[in-house]
Amino acid sequence: MPRPTKFRRVEFFPENNYFVPWGKPKCEIHEVVLKVEELEAMRLKDIEELNQEQCAEKMEISRQTFQNIIDSARKKVAIALTKGKAIKISGGHYTTKLCKLKCIDCGEIYEINYEQDRHLCPNCGSEKVICNKKADFCRRWCKGQNRKEQYEESKNK
């Protein structure tokens, strides 16, 4: 039985996720799907100019996995450019450091980097905030924070 695929850490999401060749009729356009983690691998290596080890570390994967991801990404982009195909950025197996929180007092829903302090609502300043998403990437962190808060509350009683 193969090992489960590990989530790849992604820090960047493009504003535009679809690119098409100029002047080609819609009925003739075929597309290549570039996964979100493939775009992230190219961004880290080619734009941020990090070495392979640094890229793999940032994405929380092995160097070999990083190499496989970037090879796949570059091949897809090369095919799209040489054969006049559209590039659609979508899907993949990734996670992010963003977590959606909700303020219990004012109802404000906002996103933060879950590794930073999350205890104050940016709208009203309340400390009564809860995780609004319960996604896999933040479940452990939110659960750990809730346990810590419950422990501190029981200590103060």
Curated annotation (Swiss-Prot):
<dbReference type="InterPro" id="IPR013324">
    <property type="entry name" value="RNA_pol_sigma_r3/r4-like"/>
</dbReference>
<protein>
    <recommendedName>
        <fullName>UPF0251 protein CLJ_B1488</fullName>
    </recommendedName>
</protein>
<comment type="similarity">
    <text>Belongs to the UPF0251 family.</text>
</comment>
<dbReference type="InterPro" id="IPR002852">
    <property type="entry name" value="UPF0251"/>
</dbReference>
<dbReference type="Pfam" id="PF02001">
    <property type="entry name" value="DUF134"/>
</dbReference>
